[in-house]
């Protein structure tokens, strides 16, 4: 029997990396994060497991071009999310080796903000994360980004929220036209104000996914495009 396991490769920007005394402290922090992501994924009731394959911690010296070249100096230094996700997707499309090749999803965790660039060279910080719709398993589209300002719950929510975009769900209240997968049911029947993770997140429902999100993810799982997340069950 097959098990559904979504494998993640995490890369961190220099601003996030330097918050930690050591690489092992950073890796422990990210590992704890995935316990939280698993708990949220469990609310889909689709038997989806998450697995962290590895972490690459970039420093100012080793940051790849997609990070360095797109940093808006500010102050504070920040990114335009659309520009960054596009550059990151292209970068990993052209660098399919090692964990980047083997993984189902690649996430950048950044300690810098994201938002809309203003004319004066600063950025209106308004975006916690961004990801490619239904991009799981597709080498050129399996990227996502989560900002981390060190509030544990917010961080886990963002990672789970962006993961589910990659697994084929739009925001609650959005139709199938916003999913990059033909035939998707979309989520127009679940209003954002119901407060789920893909909606406006109220106290009652902010730690679970809506019935529409479940249907969208279930639909993606039924398609050949999701083949990489099915694997033989471990004992």
Swiss-Prot record:
Enzyme Commission (EC) number: 3.4.24.-
Entry's Gene Ontology cellular component terms: extracellular region
Major subcellular location class: secreted
Claim: Hydrolase is one of the keywords in the record: yes
Gene3D superfamilies: Collagenase (Catalytic Domain)
Tissue expression: Expressed by the venom gland.
Pfam family, one: Reprolysin_5
The protein's enzyme class: hydrolase
Disulfide bonds: 137-228
Activity regulation comment: Inhibited by EDTA.
Cofactor note: Binds 1 zinc ion per subunit.
GO molecular function, one term: metalloendopeptidase activity
Residue intervals of the Peptidase M12B domain: 4-233
Record's keyword annotation contains Thylakoid: no
GO terms, biological process: membrane protein ectodomain proteolysis
Subcellular location: Secreted
Cofactor: Zn(2+)
Active site: 162
Keywords on record: Calcium, Disulfide bond, Hydrolase, Metal-binding, Metalloprotease, Protease, Secreted, Toxin, Zinc
Annotated residues for binding of Zn(2+): 161, 165, 171
Function: Acts as a metalloprotease. Penetrates intact tissue and specifically cleaves the vesicle-associated membrane protein 2 (VAMP2) (part of the SNARE complex) involved in pancreatic secretion, thus disrupting the normal vesicular traffic.
Family stated for the protein in its record: Belongs to the venom metalloproteinase (M12B) family.
Protein name: Venom metalloproteinase antarease-like TserMP_B
Organism of origin: Tityus serrulatus
């Amino acid at each position: 029997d097959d098990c559904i396991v979504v494998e993640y490769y995490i890369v961190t920007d220099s601003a996030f990396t330097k918050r930690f005394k050591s690489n092992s402290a950073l890796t422990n922090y990210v590992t704890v994060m995935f316990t939280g992501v698993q708990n949220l994924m469990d609310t889909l009731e689709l038997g989806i497991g998450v697995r962290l394959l590895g972490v690459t911690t970039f420093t100012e010296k080793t940051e790849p071009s997609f990070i360095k070249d797109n940093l808006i100096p500010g102050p504070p230094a920040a990114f335009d999310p659309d520009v960054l996700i596009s550059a990151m997707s292209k970068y990993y499309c052209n660098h399919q080796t090692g964990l980047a090749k083997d993984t189902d999803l690649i996430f950048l965790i950044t300690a810098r903000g994201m938002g809309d660039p203003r004319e004066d060279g600063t950025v209106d910080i308004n975006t916690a994360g961004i990801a490619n719709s239904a991009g799981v398993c597709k080498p050129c589209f399996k990227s996502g980004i989560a900002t981390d300002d060190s509030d544990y719950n917010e961080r886990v929510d963002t990672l789970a929220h962006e993961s589910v975009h990659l697994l084929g769900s739009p925001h609650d209240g959005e139709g199938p036209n916003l999913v990059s997968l033909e035939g998707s049911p979309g989520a127009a029947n679940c209003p954002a104000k119901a407060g789920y993770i893909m909606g406006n997140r109220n106290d009652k429902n902010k730690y679970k996914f809506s019935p529409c999100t479940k249907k969208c993810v279930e639909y993606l799982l039924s398609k050949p495009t999701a083949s990489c997340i099915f694997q033989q069950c471990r004992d």
